[in-house]
């Protein structure tokens, strides 16, 4: 009987497939006597042995990235069609962002918020003017931004709306994903996220996504302080709501004095072809959450944007983070935002996203049953059979030189860095087409 480690090693070797561009360069005997850099199999084995088993990565071991490309430890080159879940919208290791990090890292990296630093205010002024909000609360990760929004909503509910203390409720849409802390999974409808981790956060209600009548019923409760929603549900499989949904959300929240919280951590920052996905319907949320591409993938940076009547309900000592607003993260975030502006990446995402979806819709319907998305946040739904499923498609895409990852079993997300050019996109489409037709 195989041990778990032996089983993993066997799985990794089999699932990596045969790369036609790479022949076995050394014999088994040579490998035993010659020390060299770790192989992909070495890396799979080491992670399995020493790391927690809380992820199921596609078996590819990466060591370098530039722009839209990644290279593994054997030197194979790939198109990146995940963009680290839309964290590298500006492309891997964008020189402007890298140089900003390098210029700051030798000066000052962390002061905590016990003292002022000379970069935070510059960043705060830039991002608030860019998105037209009074204030920003800087954090590090996306889930921290979500937690911050929930605290703001509750505090606002008590101090402004007049909800009885500790009775405030926040409404979420089914299928949401904003992290894996206890608060985040308390709002989740995905058993993989929440099963076995209760008891859960009280005061969280869940309604169907893209369902305005359900939202209207939920907001009849005077204890509801906020509705938090993704303009497009990313982790759920790039679920795009009906036209007018976000306008309806804005109208209902205004009517019932409820905060509209837009989770733009994956959809924002040019990914969908607009600076924010809510811009498609010209609505202004009360609170906006940003993260991921806010640093271009170089450093964890997130942000919560809102106006004074909400932000100033939190007083000194009531919320914060040792690393939130540190000068290194702020300098990186300024550069990352400037790249999005200077290179017109929202416009590029809009234009190329239309091309991508038009081509994906030509794929055979007996394999691909749906195509959806906006800008360069897209997904296909794979019809699973005994011969293929989304995981097998992603393995073959990898073998053909393109990296993507399944979500929720039968869905593959296609989200390349926004710096991709049309000829590169069309080359990628050829790989996708070739792969799908091979099943």
UniProtKB/Swiss-Prot annotation:
Effect noted on mutating residue 245 to C: In HOGA; no effect on protein abundance
Known outcome of mutating residue 199 to Q: In HOGA; loss of protein stability; loss of ornithine aminotransferase activity
Main enzyme class: transferase
Pathway assignment: Amino-acid biosynthesis; L-proline biosynthesis; L-glutamate 5-semialdehyde from L-ornithine: step 1/1
N6-acetyllysine found at: 49, 66, 107, 362, 386, 392, 405, 421
Gene Ontology biological process terms, A to Z: arginine catabolic process to glutamate; arginine catabolic process to proline via ornithine; L-proline biosynthetic process; visual perception
InterPro entries listed in its UniProt record: Aminotrans_3, Aminotrans_3_PPA_site, Class-III_PLP-dep_AT, Orn_aminotrans, PyrdxlP-dep_Trfase, PyrdxlP-dep_Trfase_major, PyrdxlP-dep_Trfase_small
CDD domains: OAT_like (cd00610)
Entry-linked Pfam families: Aminotran_3
Function (record text): Catalyzes the reversible interconversion of L-ornithine and 2-oxoglutarate to L-glutamate semialdehyde and L-glutamate.
Name this protein carries in UniProt: Ornithine aminotransferase, mitochondrial
Species annotation: Homo sapiens (Human)
Lineage, top ranks: Eukaryota, Metazoa, Chordata, Craniata, Vertebrata
Gene symbol of the encoding locus: OAT
């Amino acid at each position: 009987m195989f041990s778990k480690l032996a089983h993993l090693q066997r799985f990794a070797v089999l699932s990596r497939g045969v790369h036609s561009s790479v022949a076995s360069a050394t014999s088994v005997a040579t490998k035993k006597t010659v020390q060299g850099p770790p192989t992909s199999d070495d890396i799979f084995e080491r992670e399995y042995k020493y790391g927690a088993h809380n992820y199921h990565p596609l078996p590819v071991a990466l060591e370098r990235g530039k722009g839209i490309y990644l290279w593994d430890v054997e030197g194979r080159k790939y198109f990146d069609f995940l963009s680290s879940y839309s964290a590298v919208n500006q492309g891997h290791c964008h020189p402007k962002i890298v140089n900003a990090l390098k210029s700051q890292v030798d000066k000052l990296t962390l002061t905590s918020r016990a003292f002022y630093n000379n970069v935070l205010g510059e960043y705060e002024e830039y991002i608030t003017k860019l998105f037209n909000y009074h204030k920003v609360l800087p954090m590090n990760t996306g889930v921290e931004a979500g937690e911050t929004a929930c605290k703001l909503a509750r505090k606002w509910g008590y101090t402004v709306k007049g909800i009885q203390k500790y009775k405030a409720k926040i409404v979420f849409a089914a299928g949401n994903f904003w992290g894996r802390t206890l608060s985040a999974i308390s709002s989740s409808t995905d058993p993989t996220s929440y099963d076995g981790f209760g008891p859960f956060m009280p005061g969280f209600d869940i309604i169907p996504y893209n369902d305005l009548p359900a939202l209207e019923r939920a907001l009849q409760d005077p204890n509801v302080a906020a509705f938090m929603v993704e303009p497009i549900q990313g982790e759920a499989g790039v679920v795009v709501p009906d036209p007018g949904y976000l306008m309806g959300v804005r109208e209902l929240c205004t009517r019932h004095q409820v905060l509209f919280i837009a989770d733009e951590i994956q959809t924002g920052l040019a990914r969908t072809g607009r600076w924010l996905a809510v811009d498609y319907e010209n609505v202004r949320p009360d609170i906006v959450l940003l993260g991921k591409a806010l640093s271009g993938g170089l450093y964890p940076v997130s942000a919560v944007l809102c106006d004074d009547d909400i932000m100033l309900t939190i007083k000194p000592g009531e919320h914060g983070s040792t690393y939130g607003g540190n000068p290194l993260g702020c300098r990186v975030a300024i550069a990352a935002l400037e790249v999005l502006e200077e290179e017109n990446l929202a416009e590029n995402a809009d234009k190329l996203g239309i091309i991508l979806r038009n081509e994906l819709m030509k794929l055979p319907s007996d394999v691909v049953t749906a195509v959806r998305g906006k800008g360069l946040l897209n997904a296909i739904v794979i019809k699973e059979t005994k011969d293929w499923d989304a995981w097998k498609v992603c393995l073959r895409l990898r073998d053909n030189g393109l990296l993507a990852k399944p979500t929720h079993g039968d869905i593959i997300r296609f989200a390349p860095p926004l710096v991709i050019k049309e000829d590169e996109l069309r080359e990628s489409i050829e790989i996708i087409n070739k792969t799908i037709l091979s099943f």
